[in-house]
Design a protein with these regions (language model features):
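Hydrophobic alpha-helical transmembrane segments
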Residues: 3-8, 88-89, 100, 270-274
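Small-residue-rich helix-interface/hinge motifs
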Residues: 3-74, 284-292, 297-306
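Alpha-helical transmembrane segments of multi-pass membrane proteins
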Residues: 10-14, 65, 98, 102, ...
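Alpha-helical transmembrane signal-anchor/signal-peptide segments
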Residues: 28-33, 113-130, 135
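Internal alpha-helical transmembrane segments
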Residues: 51-54, 58-122, 328
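Functional transmembrane alpha-helices
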Residues: 78, 82, 186-281, 298-321, ...
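Conserved PDZ fold ligand-binding element
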Residues: 129-151, 217
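PDZ-domain C-terminal substructure recognizer with occasional recognition of PDZ-binding tails
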Residues: 135, 141-142, 156-198
Length: 343
């Protein structure tokens, strides 16, 4: 059951990503030859109009295959016959649709569970917060100039800036205060602490829920970007990275744990995970790497600036090399995921 749930979540997110490309392609008069879910040989398919819709053997990934996207075509409705701005809109639509999906799911989640405001609930003696005079009821507004909307953002900031001092702006009784906190290592918990605990959950009205749904998506975008920075700087290693196999396992474990509290709790937990994955997929696809949407956008933006398209053969070669490297990375990550399952 847990594998089915995980594959269903992946499928919904991937289909919506590809629908972004599909709908914008149609809106710009581009011929779509095939719209598929999965990779590899076709298991099932049918043709409606000019487009073939198919289900592939391997249940990871998907594609919106447009006429003339990767090769020359004399068809006036080919991708490369359209204006550079039309092509930019089609390529960017996939990641943007991921963020839209994350927002919709976040709104449903926030309406049902509320959101954690960054209000201090308890201050621990012997740590910087108590020494600075912070009290329960203080609301964290900024950390080193970064706006804070959820208490989770405090924890994330501490993770991405472990052991670093931070300038905290907080509010008490309508007045703003600023102090600098130097974290102290907690031997028992095995981490650095500023010395306060929060996480008060509140229920908002419609407008507040809409606003905090945007913040929810922003939170996961920031978390993804912060994690990528840690990967580049060595804060995390490839052993800490999970691919499809690892995510399926994590989703399955999360489902089995949450369903013990009822199907409603499991539904909300799956929504939470879907927000994370959808926002993550949007960010990853916007990375300026060959073969990804972000890599294609780089070439299109260069074309828009210089007013002339880069040699299609050279661009195709760059994307091909990038795809091979990406596939190699996926194999490494998948092997690592499988290895961790048996540890």
């Amino acid at each position: 059951m847990k594998i089915i749930i995980a594959l269903l979540i992946f499928s919904i997110i991937i289909i919506f990503h590809e629908l972004g490309h599909f709908w914008l392609a149609k809106a710009n008069g581009i011929r779509v030859n095939e719209f598929c879910l999965g990779l590899g040989p076709t298991i099932f398919g049918f043709t409606k109009g000019e487009t073939k819709y198919s289900l592939k053997l391997f249940p990871f990934g998907g594609a919106c295959m447009m006429e003339g996207e990767d090769d020359d075509s004399s068809d006036e409705r080919a991708f490369n016959k359209k204006s550079v701005w039309a092509r930019i809109s089609v390529v960017a639509a996939g990641p943007i649709f991921n963020f839209i999906m994350a927002f919709v799911f976040a709104f449903i989640l926030v309406c049902n569970t509320g959101y954690d405001i960054p209000e201090v609930v308890e201050v621990s003696e012997g740590y910087a917060a108590a020494e600075a005079g912070m009290q329960a009821g203080d609301v964290i507004l900024e950390m080193n100039g970064k706006n804070i909307h959820f208490y989770r953002e405090v924890s994330s900031y501490a993770l991405f800036h472990e052991g670093e001092s931070v300038e905290v702006t907080y509010e008490r009784d309508g007045e703003r205060y600023t102090t600098t906190l130097a974290p102290k290592y907690d031997e028992e918990l095995g981490k650095y602490r500023y010395g306060f605990v929060g996480g008060k959950v509140v229920q908002g009205n419609l407008l507040q829920n809409l606003k905090y749904s945007v913040y929810e998506v922003k939170y996961w975008i920031d978390t993804t970007v912060g994690s990528l920075k840690m990967l580049v700087t060595g804060g995390v290693t490839l052993n800490d990275v999970s691919g499809p196999v690892g995510l399926v396992d994590a989703i399955g474990d999360s489902y089995e744990e949450s369903v013990s509290y009822g199907y409603y709790a499991a539904f909300l937990q799956m929504l939470y995970i879907s927000i994370l994955i959808s926002a993550n997929l949007g960010v990853m696809n916007l990375l300026p790497l060959p073969a990804l949407d972000g890599g294609r956008l780089v070439f299109l933006i260069i074309e828009a600036i210089r007013g002339k398209r880069i040699d299609p053969d050279k661009e195709g070669m760059v994307h091909f090399v990038g795809l091979m490297l990406l596939m190699g990375l996926m194999v490494v990550v998948m092997f690592n995921d499988i290895r961790k399952l048996f540890l």
